Amino acid sequence: MLNELEIINEAKNQTGLENFGNPLFVEGFKTLINSINKEADLNEVGVEAQKHRLIGILANILRIESAFIENPEILNEEIKSPVVIVGLPRTGSTMTHRLLASDPNHTAMLWWEGRYPAMLENEQRGNPVDRMEMGKAEVEAVMQASPDALTIHPWDYKGADEEILLLEHTFFLSLIHI
């Protein structure tokens, strides 16, 4: 079973950080842990995978909050002329997203950036090699565990991907991949 306090403490230990910032995520985090423990019927491997994922999400939240505290000017960044793609699952929205992202005049969030949005503790700005490798390993693990996953989503750690990777850090999603 997943233990809320154990997951929180492990995220703090991994990062050396304590401040999660806005506690708005806590209720959703607790609800998800309760749901996984009572409803998901996971085997030991599944429980460990979810524990690892949740520790990673909380570690990202800690790192992001730290980045905001250390660099408050981040909040003044302006996103000019955003392009927003809205679509239901399995309608081609990911491929549309990737087509638009292929234009060098556009910028898109890559899979590894969405999964690991915050710099790691020893990372040099502009050199996210470790986060890229973590993303690559995670996508490879998904492909090994479920090769058919490619039939429903074009998995590519260096490919443009959806905001769901960022939204999972809020614990406000109506969909969680387990």
Q: What residues fall within each predicted segment?
A:
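P-loop NTPase motor core
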Residues: P117-L165
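Eukaryotic endomembrane system proteins
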Residues: G159, F171-S174
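Post-Walker A helix-loop "phosphate-sensing" segment adjacent to the P-loop in P-loop NTPases
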Residues: D103-W111
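Glycine-rich phosphate-binding P-loop
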Residues: I85-A101
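Conserved small/polar residues in nucleotide/adenosyl-binding loops
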Residues: I176-I178
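Long amphipathic N-terminal alpha/beta scaffold segment
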Residues: V45-L88
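Long, basic/Gly/Ser/Thr-rich N-terminal segments
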Residues: M1-H52, G56, I64
